[in-house]
């Protein structure tokens, strides 16, 4: 493709749409990041950034964080709701609550809180869903508005800690998920002499669509039914504590792709709110939970990896629906709270690593089979001869199917001992040559060709062996088929010569990325520049800032990767602010209760027993360095 342009690359990888303006492709074919929207012309080349970090001693893979993206996401979400409130003359405010389960890393939480440090009245709070998370937010919430929302299942200790938070000066909303939690709250609040701030999680009848739709609906794991909510109201009245009920919460599930689902959920929950007010409850906060989606594939659709709405539309719909319902019931408008963790964090982090090798099919000349060869091989040669003679378009599909059928028969004959290994190898090479030739002759404009084009792209794709663990760094790609944009970090100024799939370095056949953003859709292979052993080849995995770190596991004992915080200064200078070392081999051994110190003693015994004296020190040093080393491959330079 001599007419390839950078615009073709941008469209081919759909960068413009999924990146939200934070990532792009330069005119030189390099992937860049623009972390500071105030200075959009200040860009960082990710390829050069990674090489600089390696020179500074930071081994790949490395997770790179851009805190300025977090700041922008916080402020843009608050601004969207502020504008919607003004537009619809809504008579209350908006509070953004960050659920730290999405990414509990201290750097991430602190940067989110710092995003509104200059505001006189911050619009930020924190959410906890467990006792460890609550202990964290009790220490950090004073940097925000000191609002804490406590979700999740609770025991007496959890409730005591939440009530102690009130004594520490925080505004702590204890959201009741089960009816039994109310009894514990009443007892512990009386014992501590603290008036609790209570919330209810309503179990809506409406259920949104998506991978997390089980979070809503009548069979949801969480929340109270209408009858249970009435019981809570009655028990609070009996204890003269109805004024403590101040918040209504619901959650449709993460990554809600359709704005109509959000409207419908808010509408139903809004009526719960107004009915509670009519019963005398002092509810003044309306917590819509999560659900604000991330457009991972950039298609602006209702797919599980996308969303059919923008930020302004999201805020407008919530404010508009709630305004109308409150006016209908003649009830005061509550403060709106959202827990939009995925939206805040997904874009800020990129995993950068290197391709350590490839397995690629290269067309080879094939010679006709010997005259005495089985007839099957002669049939395959005939198909190839017909194809190389430039068969017409109508015959292409027939030739392809004949070749596939012949290959299956060849495998069957080999299994029966009727085909030699050399004959089987010839049949496989002949089939690959037919596939390669057919692939080049088919046209995507012909709808009958498209399924075969997809099939051949997958069959003939290069295998890129990439220095990372899918299970550690992209667990959702494996566990729930989540799509993450993947890009080579350079060479995009030239037309892609190959299609490839990315395989990790675990000893597991599931360690493969099998979905890729390609234009306005999802494909099973990715168009890429050809790999060369003579030059470094870096790959970026994007939008990995939400959930992936905390969900990652240590399959094959591949641990946490190195990470770095990178900021672009007002003068355009790139500043690598901090680097956090990933797990060493000794670290991951300890995680599974293996004693690295004891192992070292065993090594010494074995070395003394089996190794010559003049080699012992060197061998022991190698073993000790191995225990202290990175769990990933370290040959990139």
Swiss-Prot record:
SUPFAM superfamilies: PLP-binding barrel. Its EC number is 4.1.1.19. Belongs to the Orn/Lys/Arg decarboxylase class-II family. SpeA subfamily. Catalyzes the biosynthesis of agmatine from arginine. GO terms for molecular function: arginine decarboxylase activity; metal ion binding. InterPro entries: Ala_racemase/Decarboxylase_C, Arg_decarb_HB, Arg_decarbox_C, Arg_decrbxlase, De-COase2_N, Orn/DAP/Arg_de-COase, PLP-binding_barrel. Its cofactor is Mg(2+); pyridoxal 5'-phosphate. The gene is speA. This is Biosynthetic arginine decarboxylase. Substrate binds at residues 286-296. It comes from the Bacteria. It is an enzyme of class 4 (lyase). It comes from Shewanella baltica (strain OS195). The modification N6-(pyridoxal phosphate)lysine is found at residue 101. Pathway: Amine and polyamine biosynthesis; agmatine biosynthesis; agmatine from L-arginine: step 1/1. It holds the Pfam family Arg_decarb_HB. GO terms for biological process: arginine catabolic process; putrescine biosynthetic process from arginine; spermidine biosynthetic process. It catalyses: L-arginine + H(+) = agmatine + CO2. Keywords: Decarboxylase, Lyase, Magnesium, Metal-binding, Polyamine biosynthesis, Pyridoxal phosphate, Spermidine biosynthesis.
